[in-house]
Design a protein with these regions (language model features):
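Acidic donor-binding loop of glycosyltransferase active sites
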Residues: 90-104, 117-118
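Conserved active-site histidine-acidic residue motif and adjacent donor-binding/catalytic loop
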Residues: 77-88, 100-105, 109
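Short hydrophobic beta-strand element within catalytic cores of glycosyltransferases
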Residues: 118-125
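A charged, aromatic-enriched C-terminal amphipathic alpha-helix characteristic of glycosyltransferases
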Residues: 161-199
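Conserved donor-binding/catalytic core segment of Leloir-type glycosyltransferases
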Residues: 17-53, 59
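A short, active-site helix/loop in glycosyltransferases that binds the activated sugar's phosphate group
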Residues: 1-18, 25, 60
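Short alpha-helical segment that forms part of, or immediately flanks, the ligand-binding pocket
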Residues: 86, 109-114, 128-129, 133-134
Length: 220
């Protein structure tokens, strides 16, 4: 389970950040399109549930940044096969995942990472995650408080060096720490009972009560 939903638990559980989120994209070419020579910055947003992902706010923020004069090409895809999502990931500069995430890197951001494309991710967990996740288990993304989403998107638009470096770190993370073989090895340790003490999480330690898909005002 995750520390972000620990408020619903009573017994200690395995922190899933210790295990990882494997993604096998070996069936698709991991080619990359270098768009540095292109005039516009290509941003991809692919919400599975637009309301829960904060899509209306994300689109409003991007429109605001366009109004500032930034050359943005927004690609929004919904209800398309995964092969189409992967195709678009290869052609974008970065992705905007969602606004209310309980993890720095959910599935869409992890797929982007395989292509070396960084993700902007919003979530209330961003400011407290270091209290509940060991540093080596934190996947690289620009994970920010929902109120900071505009500044985060703007940073990846203007700071090309940072954007590319973050994409490289994300790619290294998913190809090593979250590689299917590495995650399977950790699952085998669970099955055999060879469980390190620091994999366990006590729900009594959690102070985070927000949760994915819900604005802070709705939890009060």
């Amino acid at each position: 389970n995750s520390p972000t939903t620990a408020q619903f638990q009573e017994k200690p559980f395995i922190n899933w950040f210790e295990i990882g989120l494997p993604k096998d994209v070996s069936g698709y070419p991991l080619y990359q399109v270098n768009s540095q020579s292109e005039q516009k910055v290509r941003i991809l947003h692919s919400p599975s549930n637009p309301l829960a992902k904060g899509t209306p706010i994300i689109l409003s923020v991007i429109d605001k940044l366009k109004g500032k004069g930034y050359p943005i090409e927004l690609v929004k895809i919904e209800g398309m096969p995964n092969s189409k999502v992967l195709e678009e990931l290869a052609q974008c500069d970065f992705v905007v995942d969602q606004l209310y995430s309980d993890t720095p890197m959910a599935t869409f951001a992890a797929e982007a990472a395989h292509f070396g494309k960084p993700a902007v991710v919003g979530g209330y967990f961003a400011h407290v995650m270091h209290s509940y996740i060991r540093k080596e288990n934190i996947p690289p993304s620009l994970f920010v408080h929902p109120d900071e989403i505009e500044q985060a998107i703007e940073k990846l638009i203007v700071d090309v060096d940072y954007r590319e470096e973050l994409g490289r770190r994300a790619q290294t993370f998913v190809r090593t720490r979250w590689a299917p073989e590495a995650v399977a090895t950790r699952f085998l340790r669970l099955i055999t009972g060879d469980i390190p003490v620091d994999w366990w999480f006590d729900p009594q330690d959690i102070r985070y009560v927000h949760g994915g898909g819900i604005p802070e005002a709705h939890t009060r």
